[in-house]
């Protein structure tokens, strides 16, 4: 369960989307806090609202929530990452203009996601809703918290869970398959499907009535996940802390280009 929701606030219209999104989907969170990093970069040409005023307006709109406003000093990514925890959710805004997002190769949101000690979400300003919760399955060594977190999101939204594993054969060949060998190709896919079933076993046990769709797709991981979640309500992906920071393009691409909100779940995230 998410016990606290922290929303990064920069006073712009981009910050409004994650705030309302969080209120809608996490009504049982114990508290909401809006964090404004004073001196941080703001969006040019947009009307700005101070964090205190924003917190008061949010409190008036949602009187059942405990709401606090925080002024902080320092580097934006570091300040926000320091406020994360395994039982809390950090929510950030994302640009709605895809071309504009393409230019931000080292986005603040991405830097926060790399350091966060708990789950963190990026909500595109242009998001208007969708169907299904899509989750990426990297392999048999995935932390169970990733799939269980995605399942819980699907249950709370009354949506299907669409579990996607992207098979990336070495040098274009399936494991144990020869070029043009359909039997080897089918055997390769069946092995991946068994792995997906095994990974989803804890989810099926915890949520026996949850509709689950299993997909094994060949292609580039980022492209497949973005296509699968194009009209989704949510995309959930795990964070591989074993990979070097400069070799995590999947999370980066998803944050920059996803049309759906993205939740990145680090190892050790608490799931009730």
Locate predicted features.
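N-terminal membrane-targeting/anchoring modules of bacterial envelope and secretion proteins
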Residues: 3-9, 15-28, 32-35, 39-41, ...
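Glycine-rich, Arg-bearing micro-motifs that act as flexible, cationic patches
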Residues: 69, 92-111, 130, 230, ...
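Structural beta-alpha unit
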Residues: 14, 39, 59-90, 97-99, ...
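Short beta-strand elements of ligand-binding domains
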Residues: 91-94, 119-125, 262-267
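Short conserved AdoMet
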Residues: 27-28, 84-85, 117, 155-156, ...
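Small/aliphatic-rich secondary-structure junction motif
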Residues: 1-45, 132-183, 204-205, 211-212, ...
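Structured core of small recognition/catalytic domains
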Residues: 160-252, 261
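Extended, non-globular alpha-helical segments
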Residues: 103-126, 179-180, 184-187
């Amino acid at each position: 369960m998410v016990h606290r929701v922290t929303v990064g606030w920069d006073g712009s219209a981009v910050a409004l989307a994650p705030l309302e999104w969080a209120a809608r989907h996490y009504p049982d969170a114990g508290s909401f806090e809006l964090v404004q990093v004073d001196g941080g970069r703001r969006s040019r040409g947009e009307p700005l609202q101070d964090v205190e005023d924003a917190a008061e307006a949010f409190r008036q709109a949602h009187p059942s929530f405990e709401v606090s406003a925080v002024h902080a000093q320092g580097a934006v990514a570091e300040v926000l990452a320091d406020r994360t925890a395994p039982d809390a959710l950090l929510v950030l805004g994302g640009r709605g203009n895809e071309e504009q997002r393409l230019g931000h190769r080292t986005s603040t949101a991405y830097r926060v996601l790399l350091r966060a000690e708990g789950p963190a979400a990026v909500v595109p300003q242009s998001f208007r809703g969708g169907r299904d919760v899509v989750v990426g399955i990297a392999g048999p060594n995935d932390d169970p918290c990733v799939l269980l977190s995605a399942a819980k999101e699907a249950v709370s939204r009354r949506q299907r869970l669409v579990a996607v594993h992207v098979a990336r054969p070495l040098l274009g060949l399936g494991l144990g398959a020869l070029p043009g060998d359909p039997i080897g190709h089918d055997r390769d896919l069946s092995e991946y499907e068994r792995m997906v079933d095994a990974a989803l076993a804890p989810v099926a046990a915890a949520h026996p009535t949850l509709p689950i769709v299993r997909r094994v797709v060949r292609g580039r991981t980022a492209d497949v996940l973005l296509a699968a979640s194009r009209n989704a309500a949510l995309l959930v992906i795990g964070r591989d802390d074993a990979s070097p920071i400069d070799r995590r393009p999947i999370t980066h691409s998803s944050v920059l280009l996803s049309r759906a909100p993205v939740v990145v779940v680090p190892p050790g995230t608490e799931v009730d």
